Amino acid sequence: DRKFVTGAMNMPISDTVRARIAYGSNTREGMVQNVATGNLMDDRNDASVRLSIDWDINDTTELKFTYSGQKSDDNRPQEETAYCQPDPFFGCSPYSLGQMNRAPDSRGTAFGLFGFIGLLYPGTVTNDFGSAAFSDDFSKLYRDREPTHLQKTEFSNLELVKELSDELTLVAKYSYGTRMFQQMNDNDSVVNTSPMVGAGAALGLPPIVADVCFGTSRFGFCETATSNRAYDFSDVVNDSQQYEINIVSNYDGPWNFTAGYYAYDYRSDNEYRVQTVGSQLIGSFGDHPYAPVVANLLGVDFSGKGGVPFYQGLLGVLAQAPGALTTQGMMAMGLTPSLAQLLALQQFGASVAGLAALPDVNVPVDLRGTLSDQHVRIKSKALYGEAYYDINDTTKLTLGLRYDDLGNATTTFNGGLLASAWIAAGGPLYENRMDVPGLTLYDIQEETAVNGKIAIQKYLQDDVMVYASYTTATKGGGINGGNDPAPYDKEDTAVIDFGLKAKLLDGAMLLNMNIYQNDNSGMLLDTIRNTQSFNINVDAEVTGFEGLMKVFLSDTTSVDLTWLFVDAEITSDTRTGNYLEPAGATGIVQYLGPVDPNGTGFLTGAVFDNGQVWYKSGGFNCLTPLGFNPAANIFCPLSEANPVSLQGNDLPRVADTSYSFSFTQLFPGDNGVTSARLSYRYTGERNGDPFNMSRFDIPENKSFDFLLRYTPNNGDWYVGMYAKNLADDQYMNAIRSGSNAQGGQLYASFTDPRSWGIQFGSSF
């Protein structure tokens, strides 16, 4: 069930002051059942308000104030479903879309690495998600926990309009906006049913059951985990200010102009983290159920310790423990151990002493797992102007010029995988992680740009106008996040546009259409690189033909048609690596399995059909197994992915063809009018990947909608009904990938199923 309510009230406070308040709410029950909990999810709970106040200070001065606020607090997911073909090397095979809502194979992901270090496996990394419960039904999913979605936005604008004279008007504006966004998702998209056998299984210990906390202190939760699982958290806060002052002319002659100054100041803190049971236990051994067992076994309390160095040492101690305990038992019974047993016991004692000598570490919950954290400030200033010249009564020329001063200051935090760099840099000694020496990179991108516009419009008849324009623009560069905060360049765009706006057939046809070409230099495309999204610059060309036509077949019958035909491709020979498929091959011919000396699966390998051998650790790629240990913040010394050319590829997420058609019929009556409208919408196939891999193909989308409404002659109210997606076909309309560290699982959004409802509105 869904309820959508809107309303507005005009309030004439005085002869010179008037106000208007508007509100809206959108509530909907969940459309998807979480089979694991029995709860409904994917609901809606939105509320918004808007207040405007206009004050006529005098005959030439007006002050306008506007405030709007919006809040969403529900359990909608970021995407409806996931896809994966489990693969022991990649996590998810990059060569096929795979099955709906399958989890990646742990052996090819950071989840498996975290689990191994966190003592969840008895000796080697296994695919503990292999028997997980999953669903291929849109309406029924398996999730350990329903998602949470919270967003709050506020925006205020103050505008002063002053008529300086009959010919000149001054407009000054100031606006301020804020946004807070928090989203939590079940990242693995399944309910894992495999117990966490644990590294202590050889000592006769039962499977691990742990009380684990995820997220942050202000945005997270704690739960009891009997199996491994992964959650992701997006936490974004930003605010922006805009200032603008301009002068607009209204001369009687052929020349007019507008000129002004604009400033923009934007600040954001964007955090994204992925956490598993293993990552959270690694942060503090005091949270691990093995802590009291180890204390009893060794006579040493390690509950104050944590982090990768401690856990890796503890793995060695646990491996040595059965033999050491046997030797100690023999000595207690008066038996003489062998020399090898005595040496092993001595080594065991040294290992325990080494662990005890490590400094105490308790990694904060929000630093455990993977964390991408960027603080960005964007500042820009611009001087601009446009001049308008009426060449004659039917022809107008527009000339524009804009000067921009663009700046991007970015601070990127890099605490390392599992906070390994944070520990090594002395992070526990600092209250604020941003103050830890060596863990933040501060970089500034500054540039200036001059752009322009030239346009001409010509009335061929009173109701037929053609135009042509050429416009250039620049978007500033910035810094990528994650463990490789490399800069990306500015983006320059030049657009040429030819169009027609006309009323034809004595006003029975309204027609707007245009042909355009965008020439983009340095267009930003998002790719995947290890634990984060990574922007690259490419040159691209976009050519399109779009239009809108409305035809009145009679006084009571009309049709509407819109269309967009686009050819969009990458034109530069930009070469970059595909971290989801680093070899540039078409398949794997041999899985090498664990290739680390102890056969733990800490490092795995595979031979590809192009003859290359690649290695992975925690989902990270490398062309060599040597000097490669992401868990210790030691990343690949050689190539992480073969560079491939993107030239000739289609731009991601751009459909070649899209159009809509609507038929409207009016049925006039003595007391009012009934209108019936049937609409059809079509969007063609597209691909969501800069590398155009087939698993990112998005099929064509089609839908029929129907609207029936009755409005009385006085127009004071209306009543109607609607039905959307009459055929009840759900289509994928977006797809993206998780990182290679997450196994490259795909996340897809789909159109809503068929829905219908009643509408009613009134003015009073």
State where each predicted segment sits:
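Solvent-exposed loop segments that connect transmembrane elements
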Residues: 31-40, 77-142, 188-231, 275-371, ...
